[in-house]
Design a protein with these regions (language model features):
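Short amphipathic alpha-helical segments, especially helix-boundary/capping motifs
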Residues: 1, 13-19, 46, 69-73, ...
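Flexible, acidic/Gly-rich N-terminal and inter-domain linker regions that tether
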Residues: 1-69
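Structural signal for hydrophobic packing residues in well-ordered secondary-structure cores
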Residues: 12, 44-48, 74, 96, ...
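A generic short-segment signal for beta-strand/edge and adjacent turn/coil regions
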Residues: 23-30, 41, 76-78, 123-124, ...
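Canonical Radical SAM [4Fe-4S] cluster-binding loop centered on the CxxxCxxC motif
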Residues: 52-91, 114-115
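Conserved Radical SAM active-site core
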Residues: 79-213
Length: 213
């Protein structure tokens, strides 16, 4: 009998069609977790080897305001909180240069999603900086880091449309996207993603599709 590991290694999972989805779904629900772990490990090692690499990053929270209100989030600050803010270009550069001193190669821009679409405070703060949208400001901060430092920007900006992705692609080394769940149930009243427009699964999936996953 052919092993589960062999079946997986005979297929390129990144070129999967509907029939293969059904095939793997059947295997998942009819195999033990140990076999699945063994199969996944075997496939990983075959294609990527056993070397783990890393790149030192400095974390730069460009804004800790967000229009989403995920109940588990400890990063976001409500605009009424005195600690809620948008970092200035000077603060970004100061953090970047501190990262250089520590031997960092990348700068990780993390930020809440589109706070200006919900609250007045981030809207006013962006206007003071000369911007209407957080993604436009983020794009220019990536340019600033590239022009003034040796660091490579990495962006975690959440849901983006194709236009925003193209803009950011030109000024950052990589972009991250968290697909926490594909469950619509979690967006219902009482769920952790209730009243969080950017956590509706289809919105995040559309970003991945636009990025050319």
């Amino acid at each position: 009998m052919t092993s589960l590991s062999t079946h997986l290694n005979d297929r390129k999972l990144w070129k999967i069609d509907k029939d293969e989805v059904a095939y793997y779904r059947h295997m998942v629900f009819n195999s033990s977790i140990e076999k699945l772990i063994d199969a996944a490990s075997s496939k990983r090692d075959k294609h990527w080897g056993n070397v783990i690499s890393y790149s030192r990053k400095i974390f730069v929270p460009l804004t800790n305001m967000c229009r989403d209100t995920c109940s588990y989030c400890t990063f976001v600050k409500h605009p009424d909180d005195p600690d809620a803010k948008i970092m200035s270009p000077q603060e970004v550069l100061l953090s970047a240069r501190e990262g250089e001193k520590k031997g960092c190669k990348e700068l990780l821009f993390s930020l809440g999603e589109k706070p200006e679409k919900r609250y007045a405070k981030p809207t006013r703060a962006l206007e003071t900086l000369g911007y209407e949208a957080m993604t436009d400001y983020l794009t220019d901060m990536c340019k600033l880091v590239i022009e003034k430092t040796s660091l490579l920007p990495h962006v975690n900006a959440g849901t983006l449309n194709e236009y925003e992705i193209v803009k950011l692609k030109n000024v950052c080394a990589s972009m991250g996207m968290m697909l926490e769940t594909t469950s619509k149930r979690l967006t219902q009243k009482g769920g952790p993603h209730y009243a969080c427009p950017d956590k509706v699964p289809i919105q995040r999936i559309r970003t991945l599709i636009s990025a050319g996953y």
